[in-house]
Swiss-Prot record:
Subcellular locations according to the entry: Cytoplasm
Family: Belongs to the endoribonuclease YbeY family.
Keywords: Cytoplasm, Endonuclease, Hydrolase, Metal-binding, Nuclease, Ribosome biogenesis, rRNA processing, Zinc
Location (main, coarse): cytoplasm
Name the UniProt record assigns to this protein: Endoribonuclease YbeY
The keyword Nuclease is assigned to this record: yes
Top-level taxonomy: Bacteria, Bacillati, Bacillota, Bacilli, Lactobacillales
Length: 162
């Protein structure tokens, strides 16, 4: 999987940037995503996170990670309008699945609050957002149990334990 990383803050260590690419590629293999899959991750500060949270979620505060899933729109492609394209073909035509915005301020706060490393927190946020982009959620206890178990399984197998 190709991951484009942008550090808007200029404060994220290169080790965290590399770890983020690696843990997302690891998670993509776990979900059997195609190698051609693409996504982006942007590291932001709390001010930008607040702005994005308000814009996309109508929530007036910063948050740790914002996940924006991208689904290709059939109207973007030229073909007979009576023709329906299979999901697999749409994915091949546009392999971009979404983007994450991770707040470096929230990552530091939460690592301290939970008593684990900053590396673990960045990994947790990246995998959490990645799973949201891939259809996982935690609105119900059942969904939460499934998502968090998979998230922990990925992080532990990768080596980011508590």
């Amino acid at each position: 999987m190709y991951v484009e990383l942008v550090d808007e803050t200029g404060q994220v260590p290169s080790e965290i940037i590399e770890q983020t690419k690696e843990v997302l590629a690891f998670a993509a293999k776990k979900l059997d995503l195609k190698e051609s899959t693409e996504m982006s991750v942007t590291f932001v500060d709390n001010a930008r996170s607040h702005e994005l949270n308000l814009q996309y979620r109508e929530t007036d505060r910063p948050t740790d990670v914002i996940s924006l899933e991208y689904k290709p729109d059939e109207s973007e492609f030229f073909f007979d309008e009576d023709m329906e394209l299979p999901e697999e073909l749409l994915e091949e035509m546009d392999p971009f699945i979404g983007e994450l915005f991770i707040s470096i301020d929230k990552a530091a706060e939460q690592a301290a609050d939970y008593g684990h490393s900053i590396e673990r927190e960045y990994g947790w946020l990246a995998v959490h957002g990645f799973l949201h982009i891939n259809g996982y959620d935690h609105y119900t206890p059942e969904e939460e149990s499934e998502m968090f178990a998979l998230q922990e399984e990925i992080l532990t197998a990768y080596g980011l334990t508590r």
